[in-house]
Amino acid sequence: MAKDIRVLLYYLYTPIENAEQFAADHLAFCKSIGLKGRILVADEGINGTVSGDYETTQKYMDYVHSLPGMEELWFKIDEESEQAFKKMFVRYKKEIVHLGLEDNDFDNDINPLETTGAYLSPKEFKEALLDKDTVVLDTRNDYEYDLGHFRGAIRPDIRNFRELPQWVRDNKEKFMDKRVVVYCTGGVRCEKFSGWMVREGYKDVGQLHGGIATYGKDPEVQGELWDGKMYVFDERIAVDVNHVNPTIVGKDWFDGTPCERYVNCGNPFCNRRILTSEENEDKYLRGCSHECRVHPRNRYVSKNELTQAEVIERLAAIGESLDQAATV
């Protein structure tokens, strides 16, 4: 299948005047050329992933590079056979990635233009991975790590990025006196988080410049020492990184077998991302727990128009029943 679609991943920390109006104007331009994607705009900068054919994406890159302060913005490009998005969104937010340091007066925000960790090239990052005295910290969410991660990297027990600072404070004895290198998908999270670690007193903090996306495309390292796939926030869900000796590390939520297929739990009030096969999705009604399987608003049940009798039958097949139900 021809790969005539390009997916652009990018970000830039740069002051944007009248960012709300900038976002509105940006959306109008994107729609005018038929671009699809999701872009966040804040006073501190811009962060986005967009997709379109060659002509459309080239128009977009030329447009962005024509904007004051964005002449050198770095686009990371994937070639794909299908669009990565169905619609176009440009939204104004407080931050281009929500670390939330100022939430509940936890801490002051970080400006990566003033404080950030040392940039590591893919080659330098690979060397860090092989150094037993270096701590490698994954700054992404738990479900991203579970699909794929760098070999030996620490998996913080967090559901979202804004929980990471507290997790680090709670576990600082593990790596306070060591060299720490961090990584994320494209680099935007690490710019801010590595700066926060520097401010916390960590003496030697590095970050993978350009993120996992750049590491996988580097002609020298070719994604080596990455296990599994990289989670992405678009229709693709998962993309390849390791082009030397790829492996599968994801495990099916229900039976632990190798799996790289993500779905959201059928209970809309849970919405946990779970790895599972189509067979197990059907078998367990896409519910990550019994409570989610029998929830009255289970989306799998409604989408497939299952009758109560059919639900009872499937529950019985896995040793469960409706009268075990509890409210979530």
Swiss-Prot record:
Transmembrane segments: none annotated. It holds the Pfam family Rhodanese_C. The active site is at 184 (cysteine persulfide intermediate). GO terms for molecular function: oxidoreductase activity, acting on paired donors, with incorporation or reduction of molecular oxygen. The keyword Nucleus does not apply. PROSITE patterns: RHODANESE_3. It catalyses: uridine(34) in tRNA + AH2 + O2 = 5-hydroxyuridine(34) in tRNA + A + H2O. Residues 130-224 form the Rhodanese domain. Keywords: Oxidoreductase, tRNA processing. Its EC number is 1.14.-.-. GO terms for biological process: tRNA modification. Catalyzes oxygen-dependent 5-hydroxyuridine (ho5U) modification at position 34 in tRNAs. Belongs to the TrhO family. HAMAP family: TrhO (MF_00469). This is tRNA uridine(34) hydroxylase.
